[in-house]
A protein has these predicted regions:
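A glycine-rich helix N-cap at a beta->alpha junction
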Residues: 74-93
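Active-site/ligand-binding-proximal alpha/beta "capping" segment
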Residues: 196-248
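Short acidic-hydrophobic, aromatic-tinged amphipathic segments that line or gate anion-handling sites
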Residues: 3-8, 79-84, 174-182, 240
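Boundary-proximal intrinsically disordered activation/regulatory segments immediately upstream
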Residues: 1-67, 155-156
Length: 269
C-alpha cells in the first residue's frame, strides 16, 4: 500500500474531493470514468460490500492504522492520500466524514425491468429533488421492507455526496434504477399495483386493508412542494392519504415515505 502525504489543500490529488462539482464527477461525456465520493468508514464499507470499485482514499493521518485500517486492507492496490487535520478541515463538511473519504467509480445503471422481477414492494420517486430527502427515503426503504427504489430522471442523484451520507450507505444496500416515460405501464405489465401518495377526495387511507393485501405494490411519492403530477395520479390504481391530526394535511416527503413504508413494506422477520 502506497501512502501519499498531502500538506497543501490545493494539491491536485484533492480535486476530486474538494473542487469537482457533482456534475463534473458524474462526467456524462465519459461515463466509464464517472465517480462519486463516499464518506465515513461505515458508508465506505457498505459501498465496498456492494461491489463499488475504489479509486483513491483520503483520510486523516491517524486513521491509517486506526479505524481506516480494515478498509485499506481490503484495497491494497488503491492510492491513499493522508493529511493532518489542519489541512483536511479546509474541506467543506469534513467534520461530517468521520475522517475518511473514498472516491469510487459509479456502478453501471440497472434495468428496472430486471430489478423488479423478484420484488414485491417498491418505492417510486417522481422528481424528488433534495439530496437530503432522497438519502432519508433510501434509509427508510432499507429499514422498512422495500425491495427497490425507482426514480425518474429529473430528480436528485442517489450517489450525490449528501444523499449517500444521509442514507448512511443504504443507497448501496437497496437496489435502484431510473425509470423512463411510461413507467406506470411497465409496473402494471410486471404485475404491480400502484399507490399514489396524494391528497385527493377519492383517496383511501394508508391503513386500507386492500393495500397491504396486494401481492405486488409500488408506493409512488412526489416531488417536494407540488407532489405528484396529475397524470401520474390518474395512471395509478390507488390514491392514498396518511390520516393526520390538528388540521395538518401533509408531511415532508421523507417523513411521509417512512410512514408509508412502515405500513406497506414487507414485515420484518
Amino acid at each position: 500500500m502506497e501512502i501519499h502525504q498531502i500538506t497543501d489543500f490545493n494539491a491536485p490529488e484533492l480535486d476530486v474531493y474538494a473542487r469537482l462539482t457533482e456534475n463534473q464527477l458524474v462526467n456524462r461525456a465519459d461515463p466509464e470514468n464517472a465517480l462519486f465520493v463516499a464518506e465515513s468508514p461505515l458508508v465506505i464499507g457498505r459501498a465496498l460490500d456492494a461491489g463499488c470499485a475504489p479509486v483513491s482514499f483520503l483520510m486523516e493521518q491517524k486513521h491509517i492504522e486506526g479505524k481506516g485500517a480494515a478498509l485499506l486492507a481490503r484495497c491494497p492496490d488503491v492510492a491513499v492520500y493522508a493529511a493532518e487535520l489542519d489541512v483536511l478541515t479546509q474541506l467543506t463538511g469534513f467534520h461530517l466524514t468521520r475522517g475518511m473519504l473514498c472516491a469510487m467509480r459509479r456502478p453501471k445503471l440497472r434495468d428496472p425491468a430486471v430489478l423488479l422481477q423478484d420484488a414485491s414492494r417498491v418505492a417510486v420517486l417522481e422528481n424528488v429533488m433534495n439530496p437530503t430527502n432522497l438519502g432519508a427515503i433510501f434509509r427508510s426503504a432499507a429499514a422498512l421492507g422495500m425491495d427497490a427504489v425507482l426514480l425518474t430522471s429529473a430528480g436528485s442523484d442517489p450517489l450525490y455526496r449528501r444523499a449517500v451520507r444521509v442514507s448512511m450507505g443504504t443507497v448501496f444496500q437497496v437496489p435502484w434504477a431510473y425509470l423512463s416515460e411510461g413507467w406506470t405501464e411497465l409496473l402494471h405489465t410486471l404485475g404491480f399495483r400502484t399507490a399514489a401518495m396524494a391528497l385527493r377526495d377519492d383517496s383511501v387511507r394508508l391503513d386500507d386493508p386492500r393495500l397491504a393485501a396486494e401481492r405486488k405494490l409500488a408506493v409512488v411519492m412526489g416531488t417536494e412542494g407540488d407532489g405528484l403530477a396529475d397524470a401520474t395520479i390518474a395512471a395509478c390504481d390507488y390514491t392514498v392519504r396518511i390520516p393526520m391530526h390538528h388540521g395538518v394535511d401533509s408531511l415532508n416527503v421523507a417523513a411521509a415515505s417512512a410512514v408509508a413504508f412502515y405500513q406497506l413494506g414487507k414485515p420484518a422477520e
